[in-house]
């Protein structure tokens, strides 16, 4: 039951941030939901940093992992919104837009995760 509390608290914060990002960034482009891309890229950057942290300090409690990764990042990032937005572009015969959004999410998120790990490693070395 305690694990559910940690996940839920993280999810409240992650979902709130995702909603705010959508409000701020979605109006910028009419061709696709820019807020979803920003939320996913930011979430992947943060998970990269957290992966580096958890790899270096495996003794960090599972509660923090549940709060940050499962709760916060799980609700901040959104595969279902990304999927529905790409499918909608395809169904509206906006094939190029759909493919571009698909590639931005896929490769952008992978790159941001790697960047997050590198950022953690560099900061860790500078601070030690």
UniProtKB/Swiss-Prot annotation:
Is Signal found in the keyword set? no
Activity regulation information from UniProt: Na(+) is not transported, but it plays an essential structural role and its presence is essential for fluoride channel function.
**Quick one: a GO biological-process term for this protein?**
cellular detoxification of fluoride
Concerning NCBIfam families, the annotation shows: crcB, PRK14196.1
Q: What is this protein called?
A: Fluoride-specific ion channel FluC
Looking at the record's lineage, which domain of life comes first? Bacteria
Question: Which keywords accompany this UniProt record?
Answer: Cell inner membrane, Cell membrane, Ion channel, Ion transport, Membrane, Metal-binding, Sodium, Transmembrane, Transmembrane helix, Transport
Q: Does the keyword Cell membrane apply?
A: yes
Transmembrane segment boundaries: 5-25, 34-54, 67-87, 99-119
Q: Which GO terms describe its cellular component?
A: plasma membrane
Query: Which family, according to the similarity comment?
Result: Belongs to the fluoride channel Fluc/FEX (TC 1.A.43) family.
What function does this protein fulfil? Fluoride-specific ion channel. Important for reducing fluoride concentration in the cell, thus reducing its toxicity.
Q: What is its main location?
A: membrane
Write out the GO MF terms.
fluoride channel activity; metal ion binding
Organism field: Haemophilus influenzae (strain PittGG)
Report residues binding Na(+): 74, 77
Spell out the subcellular localization from the entry.
Answer: Cell inner membrane
Membrane topology of the entry: Multi-pass membrane protein
Q: Which reaction does it catalyse?
A: fluoride(in) = fluoride(out)
